[in-house]
Amino acid sequence: MMKNIQQVKAFAKLNLTLDVLGKRDDGFHELITIMQAIDLYDEISIEFTSKKAVSVAADFELPEGSVAFNAANEYMQRTGSGGANINIKGRIPPMAGLGGSSADGAAVLRAMQRHYGLMDRPSLYALAAQLGSDVPFLLEGGAAICRGRGERLEPISAGILAGLCYLVVKPGPGISTAQLFAGLRPPYAGAKSDEARLALQADDKRLFLSCISNALEPPAAELLPSIGHILKRLRRCGALAAGMSGSGSACFAVFDDKNKALAAAEGFVDAGIDFCGVFNPISGFDIYNKQDLCYNNGSGWDEGRIR
């Protein structure tokens, strides 16, 4: 019998803006952030089985109770679906603020729904929010302004974002998100996300670029000074803007000319940086619209057409 194996991509994200509004009663921080999915991805192979069991293997060390495992297991438990054997080939660097583990969980959840089709949209997004703050956004990608812990989404049309590309650079060490937020104290850096959203609506590229910022950057740079050094260098390499993604330690520079971005990347490669690459934004995809994912049995889906 032919095995039912499908290949999916787990796309990374960048936080183009990130503001901390305060600490909530549940211990989480209230955030507002503009996120953009990019064509940096982990490769995931999923074998769907009739057994009520889930297994996950990877070419990197998986944490106990990984988001990918929890995504498949919770879907199976809540819907009565079959199980899955999951294998992950990692490309997204860990502890980088690029959403790696959440991207894997979102891709697995997306694949489970595509294969079994047993959850309606509200239930699927409720499960995604339970799995992690970035998982709801990474379910369908594209660009969005995200509020709360990141689970309340307002999709953003491509507009001026479609013509940009990103040089992503990560130093060797990573930063623990929990450690960073545990040490976060008010007053927080000034909010830029709402102004950036208005700039996008007005197609005001200059104003939008001036809004790229991250309230977590100062405390992250205190924990890991190489973040500050990388950002200083990125801002001197001809980029339109630069910032840190999520809780770090990955930083990015914005370009509207890919050749310039590639030329800037060469300098970081020569310096022996841990991770460096140039990536494009990707458009979103609708899990519930079969025309939006080009399904190819055995070879996966064309998820998120690269702009």
Regions found by a protein language model. Give the residues of each.
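Short, basic/glycine-rich phosphate-binding loops at helix/coil junctions
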Residues: 50-62, 108, 129, 204-213
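Phosphate-handling active-site elements
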Residues: 76-87, 111-131, 257-270
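Glycine/threonine-rich beta-strand-loop-alpha-helix active-site module
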Residues: 117-157
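Short hydrophobic/aromatic beta-strand micro-patches
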Residues: 252-254
